């Protein structure tokens, strides 16, 4: 039977295809299939949870039975012994029976207590790994997410406008390089992010903790970066940064990614009621610049090159735009506001001007008493101008939810801005900087600063225009050159140079909202930090009492009253 009979039918057919999307090959198959064994266990457990539990029945007899029940949900973890120096994992068949590290020779287990009745080996150090395969399978088992896992097919129509990584040049290049992987739209594309933070607060003992997250790019923009779709794979514990040893920590994750790429895993699609082989690929990593040095260390070949497709990626690492923007703004506000100790226009900077630049009007003027006078620069505000800006920021108000209270970052006594978070700098750079400095700086200074504000505003737009990014690739170089004519050489560190690479990454990788660390990744890290602090507050007092009373340590006598409960047997006197 002929579907398109005439011109009217052809137009109608084209309209339906444009509205609903063309049918893909993965829809052609059995109308319905039974779930595989893993999916059936998952559905049976969900069904059992709906059944009323009688009074005489119990959920589980012991803790071991409860753990077995939870493992069916895909919430299990792997406990892996690791060398005390973080140089080797005891987790494969060849290394499980080893008792010492083959790299450094350190013992795997703690020394045995000969007086103990049970002689059980206790590892000196362990790590916990959360597998990603069961969680990816659950995205297809749940009817709330399974329909959205193939959304990325619908966002590739306009070649100049990119609203999602699926429409980017990097995604299309990957599909062209690996057509077999691209033929199955249900295959998963992932992004990996990590960043270090101190779980005990900024003013506590220095400690660096590195959570490793994965996000799923198959989902539409409104779901892609939500915290419920960001998976924690493991936490690299401190107290120091892992450095190049992070490759050892990532070994289980890389092996699982290789298995998902090579063989895949049988997964049940609850929407189409089909079993299929799901594969996954890691498109890129995301971190700030110090994290880039940790992830893609320059002293050896990093572990990501073990992935068979890693060499074919156009972008292997994404510079975090928000951190680049914050560092850029910090240099601007500290120099323009003449923040003592933070400004880039200090005495050493003026000496550099004398050595490397032909700007005699800014050179230090020596005096007879040995003190040099620093001439006023056109890019530095006077005290009265700084007072006006600080007062304006102090009284500035925004709509609810638009921005945080920037008044808390204003110090009226010292006339400086302090404690600005990444989101504060993001808003100040794009919205407030051109307004704040317009009446106080000359056009030769205010103009390039405004161009930088427009640059970051275009860069962080929800819809990336490829032609616009190509324009900014050339224009940002001119803007940096204009700034070099104004500010001293000390103003330009590595962060100012990194801005030149950001338009290319946006053009190739798509909108930066899917490739930066802020908001959702930091929310997940913040939740971890809050949980650690709550646990510390609950467990510290019992630990402190037990440690002081144990007698294992020499304790200052002044600590004993802190762990001694009040005495109820006290003398009572009558009062008048």
Set out the residue ranges of the language-model regions:
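A structural signal for the principal folded core domain
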Residues: 1-576
